[in-house]
C-alpha cells in the first residue's frame, strides 16, 4: 500500500473511532439524563425513552453487540440476521452488571425474526434491550409496586413484534421468599392512562413461579416487562413483631387454660340439657382447637419439620377458624330465635343439625380445597415492612397457613366478614327490641340494664371483634394490630367469663325458685 493510501485508511479509521466515541458518549449522556427525576407527562418520560431507543437502533459500532451501563440503566444492542437461532441473556454473564442486584434473564425464541424476514431478507436486524433498575419512569395511576423495581424492555428494529407462537421468557429473581405474595407479569401499555404515559397490563403474558424466589414471565410480544407485587393489606412494621408475638402467645395460652376450665365447669354443671349451654360449649371447643393449632403453626415451619406436617397443621388451623366463625354465627342465630319469641318452637334434632353445620360444613370446605389443590396449605410468609438499608423493603415470618391469596380473601376475610356482619345485624335488632321494651316502662328496671348488658356482651363475644381485621390500613393499622391481637387471642378467656356469669345467674335463679316453692309449701 502506498503512503497516501495508508494515510487515507488511517484517517478513515480515526474518523470512525471519533464517531463511535461521540455516539457512545451521547448514549451515556441520555441514559444518565433518564436517571434524573422527570415529570409525569408523555412529553418528558416517553420522549426521553423513545429517544434512547432510536439512538440505540441507529448506533454505529464494530462487532456484533454493544453494552452500555450507568448506575441504574443498562442498554444492550445486538446485530441479528434472518438465520437467528435464538438468544439467552443472563445478568450473571453480562459484563458491567452489579452483583449486588438480584439476577434476571431474558430468552428470545428463533421465531423472533421470522416476521421481519417474510417479504425480504434484510442484511441486518437490530435487537435492543434496555434494563431499568428503577421504576420512577414507569409510575402508573395506582403507584404499583414492582419486584426489585426492575423494568426489562426489548425491541426488534423499528417494527412491532406480537403474537409469537413461542413466547419470550423473562425471569426475575429475589433474594427473599415470595410465598404469600400475589405476583403477576405485566407489560407497559402506552396510552392506557390519562394521567400518565401508560399503565401496566397483563395482556399476552403468563405468570409462573418455578420456586419461592423466582418469577418466570412468558409473553408473546416485545415491550417493557415487570412483575407487579400485590400485598394483602399494609405490611406489618417489623419492630412490632416481638410485642405482637408475645401478646398472641400469652393471650392464646390464657384462652387455652380458660377453655379447659370452661369444659370442666360444664361437666360439673347440673343444667347440661340446655341447648344454649351446649352451643356455648361447641363454640368453646372450636376456639380451643383454634388457639392450640395457632400456637403450633409457627413452630412447624422449622427446617427440621417435614413439609407434610406443616400442610396438615395449616388445614387444621383453617378448619378451626372456619368452625369458630360458624359457631359464632350459630350463636347469633340462636340469640335471634330467643329474642324473636320463637325459641320454644319445636325444631326436630335442633342441636344435631347445628353440630352438622358448625363442624361439618367447615370440614367439607377444607376437604374440597385439599382435593382440588392441596398446595394452598403449607408454610406461608407474613409481610413485615422494615428499613430500606438492605434494599428489600420487607422480611419474612413463616407460619403454617393458607398460601393462596384468593383462598385467603374468600374463605378467611369473606367468611369472617359475613359472620361479623350477621352478628352486627342481630345486635342492632336486639337493641331495637330492648329499646321498645324500655319505652313501655315508666322507669328503667334493673332487668333492662341486665338484658342490655347480656345482649351486648354475648354479641360482642360472638365475632364482632373480627371486624377489626378490615381496618388494617393507614392510620388504623397500629391500633388495629394491637386491638385485634388482644381481643381475639383472649377470646377463650372472654367466653369463660361469659359462661361463669351465666352459670351464676342460672344458679341464683334456680335458688330463688326453690325458695319460692319452699315458702309456698310452708304456707299450705
Swiss-Prot record:
Cytoplasmic topological intervals: 268-284, 341-351, 435-453, 501-524
Domain GAIN-B: start-end pairs: 74-235
N-terminal signal peptide: 1-23
Glycan attachment residues as annotated in the record: 58, 65, 96, 143, 169, 175, 390, 396
GPS, as annotated region: 185-235
Cystine residue pairs: 185-217, 205-219, 310-400
Pfam families (alphabetical): 7tm_2, GPS
GO molecular function, one term: G protein-coupled receptor activity
Impact noted for substituting residue 230 to A/C/D/E/G/F/H/I/L/M/P/W/Y: Drastic reduction in basal cAMP production
Site (Cleavage): 222-223
Record's subcellular location: Cell membrane
Modification comment: Autoproteolytically processed at the GPS region of the GAIN-B domain; this cleavage modulates receptor activity.
Region (Stachel): 224-232
Subunit structure: Heterodimer of 2 chains generated by proteolytic processing; the large extracellular N-terminal fragment and the membrane-bound C-terminal fragment predominantly remain associated and non-covalently linked.
PANTHER family: ADHESION G-PROTEIN COUPLED RECEPTOR, ADHESION G-PROTEIN COUPLED RECEPTOR G5
Task performed by this protein: Orphan adhesion G-protein coupled receptor (aGPCR). Ligand binding causes a conformation change that triggers signaling via guanine nucleotide-binding proteins (G proteins) and modulates the activity of downstream effectors, such as adenylate cyclase. ADGRG5 is specifically coupled to G(s) G proteins and mediates activation of adenylate cyclase activity.
Domain notes from UniProt: The Stachel sequence (also named stalk) in the C-terminal part of the extracellular domain (ECD) functions as a tethered agonist. In the inactivated receptor, the Stachel sequence (also named stalk) is embedded in the GAIN-B domain, where it adopts a beta-strand conformation. On activation, the Stachel moves into the 7 transmembrane region and adopts a twisted hook-shaped configuration that forms contacts within the receptor, leading to coupling of a G-alpha protein, which activates signaling.
The family this protein is said to belong to: Belongs to the G-protein coupled receptor 2 family. Adhesion G-protein coupled receptor (ADGR) subfamily.
Protein name: Adhesion G-protein coupled receptor G5
Gene name of this polypeptide: Adgrg5
Amino acid at each position: 500500500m502506498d503512503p497516501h493510501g495508508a494515510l487515507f485508511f488511517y484517517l478513515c479509521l480515526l474518523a470512525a473511532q471519533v464517531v463511535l466515541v461521540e455516539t457512545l458518549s451521547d448514549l451515556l449522556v441520555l441514559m444518565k439524563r433518564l436517571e434524573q427525576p422527570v415529570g409525569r407527562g408523555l412529553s418528558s418520560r416517553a420522549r426521553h425513552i423513545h429517544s434512547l431507543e432510536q439512538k440505540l437502533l441507529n448506533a454505529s459500532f464494530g462487532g456484533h453487540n454493544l453494552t452500555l451501563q450507568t448506575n441504574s440503566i443498562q442498554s444492550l444492542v445486538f446485530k441479528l440476521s434472518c438465520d437467528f437461532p435464538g438468544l439467552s441473556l443472563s445478568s450473571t454473564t453480562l459484563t458491567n452488571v452489579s452483583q449486588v442486584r438480584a439476577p434476571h434473564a431474558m430468552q428470545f425464541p428463533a421465531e423472533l425474526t421470522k416476521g421481519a424476514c417474510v417479504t425480504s431478507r434484510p442484511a441486518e436486524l437490530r435487537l435492543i434491550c434496555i434494563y431499568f433498575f428503577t421504576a420512577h419512569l414507569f409510575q402508573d395511576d395506582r403507584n404499583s409496586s414492582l419486584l426489585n423495581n426492575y423494568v426489562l424492555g426489548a425491541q426488534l428494529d423499528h417494527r412491532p413484534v406480537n403474537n409469537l407462537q413461542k413466547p419470550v421468557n423473562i425471569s426475575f429473581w429475589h433474594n427473599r421468599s415470595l410465598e404469600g405474595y400475589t405476583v403477576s407479569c405485566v407489560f407497559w401499555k402506552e396510552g392506557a392512562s390519562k394521567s400518565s404515559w401508560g399503565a401496566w397490563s397483563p395482556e399476552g403474558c403468563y405468570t409462573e413461579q418455578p420456586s419461592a424466589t423466582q418469577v418466570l414471565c412468558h409473553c408473546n410480544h416485545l415491550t417493557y416487562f415487570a412483575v407487579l407485587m400485590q400485598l394483602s393489606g399494609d405490611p406489618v412494621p417489623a419492630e412490632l413483631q416481638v410485642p405482637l408475638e408475645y401478646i398472641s402467645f400469652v393471650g392464646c395460652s390464657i384462652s387455652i387454660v380458660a377453655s379447659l376450665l370452661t369444659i370442666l365447669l360444664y361437666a360439673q354443671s347440673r343444667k347440661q340439657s340446655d341447648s344454649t349451654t351446649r352451643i356455648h360449649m361447641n363454640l368453646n371447643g372450636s376456639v380451643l382447637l383454634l388457639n392450640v393449632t395457632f400456637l403450633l403453626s409457627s413452630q412447624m415451619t422449622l427446617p427440621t419439620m417435614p413439609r407434610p406436617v406443616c400442610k396438615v397443621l395449616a388445614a387444621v388451623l383453617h378448619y378451626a377458624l372456619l368452625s369458630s366463625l360458624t359457631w359464632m354465627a350459630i350463636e347469633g342465630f340462636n340469640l335471634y330465635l330467643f329474642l324473636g319469641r320463637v325459641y320454644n318452637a319445636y325444631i326436630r334434632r335442633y342441636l344435631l343439625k347445628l353440630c352438622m353445620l358448625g363442624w361439618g360444613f367447615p370440614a367439607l370446605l377444607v376437604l374440597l380445597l385439599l382435593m382440588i389443590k392441596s398446595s394452598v396449605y403449607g408454610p406461608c410468609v407474613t409481610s413485615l415492612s422494615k428499613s430500606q438499608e438492605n434494599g428489600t423493603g420487607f422480611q419474612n415470618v413463616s407460619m403454617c397457613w393458607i398460601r393462596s391469596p384468593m383462598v385467603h380473601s374468600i374463605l378467611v376475610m369473606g367468611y369472617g366478614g359475613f359472620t361479623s356482619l350477621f352478628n352486627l345485624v342481630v345486635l342492632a335488632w336486639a337493641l331495637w327490641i330492648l329499646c321498645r321494651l324500655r319505652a313501655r316502662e315508666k322507669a328503667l328496671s334493673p332487668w333492662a340494664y341486665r338484658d342490655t348488658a347480656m345482649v351486648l356482651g354475648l354479641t360482642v363475644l360472638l365475632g364482632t371483634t373480627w371486624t377489626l381485621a378490615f381496618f388494617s390500613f393507614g392510620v388504623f393499622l397500629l391500633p388495629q394490630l394491637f386491638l385485634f391481637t388482644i381481643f381475639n387471642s383472649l377470646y377463650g378467656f372472654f367466653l369463660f367469663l361469659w359462661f361463669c356469669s351465666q352459670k351464676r345467674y342460672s344458679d341464683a335463679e334456680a335458688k330463688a325458685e326453690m325458695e319460692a316453692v319452699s315458702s309456698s309449701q310452708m304456707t299450705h
